[in-house]
Amino acid sequence: MKENTTFFAPMIYQKQVAPAIEFYKNAFDAVVLRQWNNDDGSVHVVEMSINGALFHMHEETTRNNELSPETLKGTSIALGLFVEDPHAVMAKSIAAGGTEIDPVQDYDYDYRQGTLADPFGHHWVLQKKIGK
């Protein structure tokens, strides 16, 4: 990735980061780029990439109300992930422990997409542009 380029990199809050790292590796072929641990060895922050799409995960913190969906009992956003084959990624994600919310289907706005919940409560919209 070029330095000084504007791009979007979400920060995903988790109760525990380590189990989420393993899920994203198995479900999305994510790779760990950098990781910072707490004194007790638990993961504090991790920088990851899914096929070049950068994101971070951080332990939830009540200090700034940066909380996980588990604590909130819901989520306020869905993370859109553009992939070559939404059906295949959905199947792989379910096998890794995710739960299908909406099956992958084609929409009249020229997207093929489906939604899943990861084991930590985050919603992912797996999608591909199929029209013009």
Model regions: which residues?
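Vicinal oxygen chelate
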Residues: 1-11, 22, 28-84, 90-117, ...
